[in-house]
């Protein structure tokens, strides 16, 4: 019996959702992530989500916080045009965890946060038995310091994403001209 409990203790922490601790402060006020943001980096274990000409890239404009959800206001490139869109992530019973039903069920985790400078979100989705992980880095300014980018890359590595699957979005058209 003790061996079984030990085995379970070694297996359970390896589940992807067990990797999510949220912001360092358990009393962090989610309202602090509201406001204007810029997409700075994107990473995924699935290369199609970060490909150069994919329609799957979303560029953040702002985040609104309600008692029940986070509302992400994005621009998305569709055939070269910047199209505004909104996605609502509904709060769950677990702190800093949200769900989205957009192209399938996704679980989004609010991870590392410095509300005056950056925020990292990590999304997990399961389709046909395969898990996809997408990690985004948003900044209050169009770019981030090398230290923040290093921390983002380190975070991605701990979630099984190779550095070749991390894209610096500051070198792409992020639909900045379409922001209001």
Swiss-Prot record:
InterPro entries: Calycin (IPR012674), Lipocalin (IPR002345), Lipocln_cytosolic_FA-bd_dom (IPR000566), Maj_urinary (IPR002971). Transmembrane segments: none annotated. GO terms for cellular component: extracellular space. Glycans are attached at residue 101. Expressed in glandular and lumenal epithelia of the endometrium. Is transferred to the embryonic capsule, the conceptus and the yolk sac. Belongs to the calycin superfamily. Lipocalin family. This is Uterocalin. The lineage of its organism: Eukaryota, Metazoa, Chordata, Craniata, Vertebrata.
């Amino acid at each position: 019996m003790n061996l079984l409990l030990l085995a379970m203790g070694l297996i359970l922490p390896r589940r992807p959702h067990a990797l999510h601790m949220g912001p360092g402060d358990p009393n962090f006020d989610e309202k602090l992530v509201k406001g204007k943001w810029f997409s700075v980096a994107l990473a995924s274990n699935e290369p199609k989500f970060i490909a150069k000409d994919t329609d799957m890239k979303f560029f953040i404009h702002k985040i609104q916080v309600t008692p029940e959800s986070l509302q992400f206001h994005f621009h998305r490139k569709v055939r070269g045009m910047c199209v505004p869109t909104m996605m609502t992530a509904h709060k769950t019973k677990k702190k800093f965890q949200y769900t989205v039903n957009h192209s399938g069920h996704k679980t989004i985790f609010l991870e590392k946060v410095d509300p005056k400078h950056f925020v990292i979100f990590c999304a997990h989705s399961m389709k046909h038995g395969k898990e996809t992980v997408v990690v985004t880095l948003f900044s209050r300014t169009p770019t981030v310091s090398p230290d923040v980018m290093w921390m983002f890359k380190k975070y991605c590595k701990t979630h099984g994403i190779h550095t070749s699957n991390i894209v610096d979005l500051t070198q792409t058209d992020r639909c900045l001209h379409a922001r209001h």
